[in-house]
Amino acid sequence: MKGPITFLLQLGAVYTSIASACKLSDLPILSAHGSYGSNQCIAFGGEQAVIDRLIDPQACDIPKLIEATADQLQDGLTKGCFTSVDLVKVRITLQTPYRQGNVLIIVVVQTYVARIAEVNSTVRAVTEINPDALTIAKQMDNERKMGKLRGPLHGLPIVIKNNIFTDDKMSSTAGSYAIFGARTSADATVATKLREAGLVIMGKSGASQWANFRSLNSTNGWSAYGGQVTAAYIKNQDPSGSSSGSGVASDLGLAFATLGTETSGSIVSPADKSNIVGLKPTVGLTSRRFVVPISERQDTVGPMARSVKDAAYLLQVIAGKDSNDNYTSAIPFDTIPDYVKACDINALKGKRIGVPRNVIKIFGSPQTVVDQFNQALAVMKKAGAIIVENTDFTSFAEFAQSPIPDDILYADSLTNLPAFFKQLKVNPHNITDLESLRRFTQHHRLEEYPSRDTARWDIALQKGIKNTDPKFWPMYQKNVKFGNEGGILGALRRHKLDAAVLPTDLSPYIPALIGSPIITVPMGVYPNGTKVNHDRELVTSGPGIPIGIGFMGDLWSEEKLIGLAYAFEQKTHARPKLKRFIQPKKEVKGIL
């Protein structure tokens, strides 16, 4: 690499370059808020926490970060056991003389960043670290010292999917070099909400390129920009997608929690495979402004966390209306519900929970998954739920054979991607539509074409139907029937259900069609003796891979679903029972 200074984050194949000729002991502060100039530097190494410690850190009951909750972390911050700076602190040492031309600067990282460095060369969950993280953490610590707390997540580090644009020094690429270096005029609305709530956006997560909407022969979690994400339970585990890195980062405690996006399964499926909670909100509950789109009808942004309560905390922050996303105007309440308060251990009592058995029969599930699913139903029944069997999705067989759901995505992408590209303030490769995106991808070496094809784009362009075409509306009405009367909403109405449940890997398809919510919770694990299957080099099924259960509900029913999922989680505590083949060892206590 060339340039006056190369700032090399030792995160496997992940590098962030900062071209700035600071002194040996200095490095530029790069501010996400634009408050520091490029000529300003700060000396790193030996920084003192801005908050005087109230007690001896060694006397604190500091949780292991792989299971730490927001409440536990806030308790430690409040007591002065550690600071937000401790969670993201970075110390820089020069390894090679500057004048040799190729300067290597090693980052000696602490806590969350150190945890990323421990495992990222294997799992590739994080594509880059925010060079502003320390600056923002110091600001949050100073505010805490002055008695100003922005909310219950104040000062906690978070990692967000790399298709969510931020107006800072980090890249937002959707995993592609086609928009590497692209800029928007502001943060994505959800990123702004995170900052306003006091969270430290610490980095970006790897994901399936273009949210799994490029290839038919690629693998979950692969992108040209970030490489191949893998999950942590067996070697070369398929992480599912497309929010692959967000799932793995949350699972391994590489941040307090993460954000993902979903069009059809892209939050709940990777959450399932990484043994965490994934909450796909109703389309319109969270803004998609400056989030790389596929479909305006199906795209949504949601939390991925190690517990239901932490997912609820995060949803509380990012939910709400946004004049820049007209789908949010459909939110039916003036005040966002208290999602954290919905976490009630008795929430299952008296609730009618439906089981659409025809989905399991038509799509098929291994018997071990069905057995564990039935055991989960027994847990709910014991907790007071009324289990209603055979609440079938009546149009599911027709849906399973229909090309229409994909055709809707093709039409939306032909319309929504050009609209997004038009919003870019900086567009280095002049990507204006799906055709120019395909052309770039097929001619750029790092995009690995044709070994990873562009079949989804090829089909969309060949069909040539946009969502403004007269042919689109009849297709869309059929799609709505699959999801509404013939799907989840019809089942809820006919059987007077509070929710329906399925093994998570079967849950996303129908709710995707009408934008209804899902929350997945850890349920179990594939046992010894499970047949090992592969997709290219990735293991898609085998002993030790997690299994989740998905709670599906009506539009805007997140409050109810969170309660049901929380009660199930507290009755089962399935997550801590599983073993990983890799996990970081760095802890807060070890760096104080």
Curated annotation (Swiss-Prot):
SUPFAM superfamilies: Amidase signature (AS) enzymes. Substrate binds at residues 242, 263-266. Glycans are attached at residues 120, 217, 326, 430, 528. It is found in: Secreted. The active site is at 161 (charge relay system), 242 (charge relay system), 266 (acyl-ester intermediate). InterPro entries: Amidase_dom, AS_sf. Residues 1-21 form the signal peptide. GO terms for cellular component: extracellular region. Keywords: Glycoprotein, Hydrolase, Secreted, Signal. Its EC number is 3.5.1.-. It holds the Pfam family Amidase. GO terms for molecular function: hydrolase activity. Coiled coil: none annotated. Belongs to the amidase family. This is Putative amidase ARB_02965. The lineage of its organism: Eukaryota, Fungi, Dikarya, Ascomycota, Pezizomycotina.
